[in-house]
């Protein structure tokens, strides 16, 4: 199963449109997970043309009155249990807190956002992934990610999506 991972789109408050390379990056995915700060449902509608979308509420969604999204979700994909949350209620970028939250949620993969910085790390048996932001990066690169699960094999790929810089970086766990 291949899953598109996105967070912190902040449309239209930070950028008017989702970069077209996001659509290209998500070609062939079975599902898209949005880790919050959607701020405009047109983003979800556009992504749903590619694959079903599950999103969670981010701190900016509350500010923009988008309170009908859940704060977290748990799904099963292949033999993996995946949690998704924004991460704004945790210390920014604290991997130990995210790992603890994953244990609380009883998941072995946790997708989060909020930092706008792409990151993947394995702590013990828990894989933590932040896809970064395709619109407001704090790392200098506008990114999304894909997560491919084939039985016990998990591959994470970060994709740079700004203008002509469509590049992929793959990590295996």
Residue ranges and their predicted role:
Residues 5-7, 31-37, 54-59, 83-86, ...:
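Active-site neighborhood of phospho(di)ester-bond hydrolases with catalytic His/Asp-centered motifs
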Residues 54-96:
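Helix-adjacent hinge/juxtasegments
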Residues 72-73, 118, 145:
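Residue-level detector of beta-strand structural context in well-folded domains
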């Amino acid at each position: 199963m291949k899953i598109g991972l996105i967070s912190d789109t902040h449309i239209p408050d930070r950028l008017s449109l989702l970069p077209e390379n996001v659509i290209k990056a998500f070609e062939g995915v079975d599902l898209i997970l949005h880790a919050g700060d959607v701020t405009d449902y047109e983003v979800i509608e556009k992504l749903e043309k590619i694959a079903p979308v599950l999103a969670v509420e981010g701190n900016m969604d509350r500010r923009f009155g988008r309170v009908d999204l859940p704060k977290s979700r748990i799904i099963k994909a292949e033999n993996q249990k995946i949690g998704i949350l924004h991460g704004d209620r945790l210390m920014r970028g604290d991997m130990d807190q995210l790992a603890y939250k994953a244990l609380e949620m009883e998941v072995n993969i946790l997708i989060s956002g909020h930092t706008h910085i792409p990151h993947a790390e394995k702590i013990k048996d828990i894989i933590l992934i932040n896809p970064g932001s395709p619109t407001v990066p704090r790392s200098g690169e506008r990114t999304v990610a894909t997560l491919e699960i084939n039985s016990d094999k998990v591959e994470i790929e970060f994709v740079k999506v700004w203008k002509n810089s469509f590049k992929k970086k793959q990590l295996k766990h």
